[in-house]
Every structure is written in structure tokens, then in C-alpha cells.
Amino acid sequence: MEVKELERDKNRVVLEYVFNREEVLEAEDKAARYLNQRVEIPGFRKGRVPKNILKMRLGEDFQEYTLDFLMDLIPDTLKDRNLIMSPVVTEREIKEDTARFVVEVHEEPEVKIGDVSKIEVEKVDEEKVLEKYVERRLEDLREKHALLEPKEGPAEVGDLVRISMEVYNEEGKNLTTREYEYVIKEGEDRPFVKDLIGKKKDDVVEIEREYEGKKYTYRLKVQEVYRRTLPEIGDELARTVNNEFETLEQLKEELKKEGKDIYDVEMKESMREQLLEKLPEVVEIEISERTLDLLVQETINRLKREGRYDQIVSSYESEEKLKEELKKRILDDIKRDRAIEVIAKERNVDVSDEELEKEAEELAPFWGISPERAKSLVKSRRDLREDLRWAILKRKVLDLLLEEVTVKVVEPRGEGDGDERKGDN
């Protein structure tokens, strides 16, 4: 086999493969053995048809099988090339005693990463977020520790109503009976709950609903109406929440720590997402238009196989507009992935087996399995292991880059005009 580079366009390389007579004959032998097990030629026993008879009877079909077996030899020659997609065979033929293939290979494109400090990510003002969090949690605790007093009068805003709900079908059969408690809120519009306003103990409300063409009757009986008295925000509330607290300030401090833990996790994730979204802005890439066009067509073919293409293309002015959008997204995705890979290599960022195990343990509850089972799965399944390794690597690289980006502190949503900037850091 001889391999020659015919053409290079950035990451796209066109290679010519030429197989000699011995290699072609060997591939013909493989094709003959393969076909002997699958075709029947009149006058010959199955599996006993001579190669020359198969060549004569099958003609071009035999040649195609021979070319297929030769094609199987090509991937091994590409192992040292990092390919972004499968090789594309543009020509293949057997001429006289040799076979010739022309193959397009699309390597991972080279990237150059610019000044990451030009990327701006937003960070919501920590003090204001925690202040709002503490206020909200204190209100939650007031609600949780409300004093309940049965009342004779009708249910009104702020009251808690305990009901039994019976559901009947069209034939009058009782399908279920359950008890519920609802707190009636200002501007109440929840189904059933709004129908309880003004009702007293022992009152009955019947409501008809239709689901999937069937009618159901809901019979709500008011078991009890309670007037709720919310405790004042003060030292007494703190002691009620936890007898280890003596003062409101101690409770607030604990709530602030609780909020800080949530804030740190959610804000770090938000900043990672912002950075990842903007990373392509500082990445220069050497990629062939042919590569992008093939990847776009590959995506369109997949959407068609999944039956989603018509719905998606209908949201664009034309197929060309869809292709433009897909091309941009694919290019940005390649920039992101290549940048992560290059930075990880340059800065010696790696993922250890211990980190993989820890990640598996943390994901186990979401997978609905035990931590030990999760770790075993990661060890036994290479695809899962590589997916996790990439997720961890990407997170570690982004965290490194977050130390270099420009961070803009902004007001929490709903605070001021929602866009006010506090400054840079």
C-alpha cells in the first residue's frame, strides 16, 4: 500500500491510497470466501464456487466487495491522526492489477486562543443576594411556624383550609378520597383553592372537570378552617426554629451561611456557562469550509432520520437560513472543544481516577443507583467514563479561565432596573 498526500486545505487532507497486485488478490480471496457463504450459483455447491466464476457471474458487485475489504485496511493508517469526523471516500476503483482510493480526512483544526481577559461575565452582587435570601427564608419560617386557631367564619385570604376531596367518574363511582391543606393567598387563582374562599367548616363544593373527553366530579368538603397568626420576626422566632439560637441575629447568621453555600455553587455554574458561551469570541481556528459543510449536512441527515427536520426548518425563513445557523453553532462548538483541549494540554490539566469515582458517587442519586454501582458502571463502560472525564476536564479548565476573565458585578434581578452595574473586579 502506498499513501500520498494530494491536497491540503487547513484541516482537510486529501490522501491517495494505491494497493498493489498482491494486496488486491488477497482482498479478492476474502471477497470470494465471504460471498461463497451468502450466494448460490447454479451448478455449484454453496461454498464451493471458484473465485473466477464469482468474478465472472457477479461482475461489478464482486469488485465492490473487493474494494470494501481493501477499504477496511485504511482506518489503521489514520490512527495517529486526530480526526473530527469519519473519513470520506471520494474515489475508488480497481484498474488492471491495482486498486486506487482517494480519501478526504478531516483532522482536528488548529486553534489559537486570544486574550481571555476580554471575556466579560456577570456576577450578581453577593451581599444583596444574601440579604434577599435571608429575608425570604425568614418569611418561610414564619409561615412554617404559624399558630393555627380554628374559626367558625368563612375562609379568607391568609387562612389555612383543610379539606377532604372525593373524585367520582361519570357513573358516580368514587375513584379516590384524599385530604389536603391549602393556605389561601392574595389573588388566589389555583384550581379548587379559589373555590374555597368564603366557605365555612362542613361546607361542600362540587366541581366538574373534563379530561381527555371524560367528565369527573370533585367533591370538596371543608373539614376545618384555621386562622393563621404568623410570629413576629425576632428572638422568639429564632428560639422556636432551633433551641440552640438565643437571638434573631444568630438565626440570620445561620441563614446567611446557608444562602452563601447555595450562592457559591449556583454563581460558579452561571459564570462557567457564560464563559463557555463567549469562549469562541477569543478563539481563532483553521478549519476548512468543506469540513463545516459536511458536518452541517450530517446534522441535517440526523434531524431527518429523527423526524424533526420539517418542524425545525419551518421556524427559519429557508433551508439556507437553517444551514447558516447550524454552521455557526457547529463552528462555535468546535472552537469551544478545541480550546478546552489545547488549554488542558498546555496547563497540564488532567482527570484522575479518584476524581472520576467522586463524580460517579455524586451522580449516583440522579441515576437512581448506589454509589458503588455508579463507580462500577464508570469502570466498565468506556463511553460513560470518557463522557465523565470530558465533563470534569471542561469544568476544571473553565475554573482556571474564570480567574482571568473580566467579572462585572450586577444587581439581582428585580433589584433596581435589573441592569445596573456595580463595577469591575
Curated annotation (Swiss-Prot):
Catalytic activity: [protein]-peptidylproline (omega=180) = [protein]-peptidylproline (omega=0)
Keyword flag Chaperone: yes
Keyword terms of this UniProt record: Cell cycle, Cell division, Chaperone, Cytoplasm, Isomerase, Rotamase
Alphabetized InterPro entries for the sequence: GreA/GreB_C_sf (IPR036953), Trig_fac (IPR005215), Trigger_fac_C (IPR008880), Trigger_fac_C_sf (IPR037041), Trigger_fac_ribosome-bd_bac (IPR008881), Trigger_fac_ribosome-bd_sf (IPR036611), Trigger_fact/SurA_dom_sf (IPR027304)
Compartments where found: Cytoplasm
Record domain PPIase FKBP-type: where: 158-231
SUPFAM superfamilies: FKBP-like, Triger factor/SurA peptide-binding domain-like, Trigger factor ribosome-binding domain
Cellular component, GO, one term: cytoplasm
Enzyme Commission number, as recorded: 5.2.1.8
Keyword match Iron-sulfur: no
A Pfam family it matches: Trigger_C
GO molecular function, one term: DNA binding
One BP term from GO: cell division
Protein's job: Involved in protein export. Acts as a chaperone by maintaining the newly synthesized protein in an open conformation. Functions as a peptidyl-prolyl cis-trans isomerase.
HAMAP family to which the protein is assigned, alphabetical: Trigger_factor_Tig
Domain comment as written in the entry: Consists of 3 domains; the N-terminus binds the ribosome, the middle domain has PPIase activity, while the C-terminus has intrinsic chaperone activity on its own.
Family (UniProt): Belongs to the FKBP-type PPIase family. Tig subfamily.
Protein's UniProt name: Trigger factor
Species in which this protein is naturally found: Thermotoga neapolitana (strain ATCC 49049 / DSM 4359 / NBRC 107923 / NS-E)
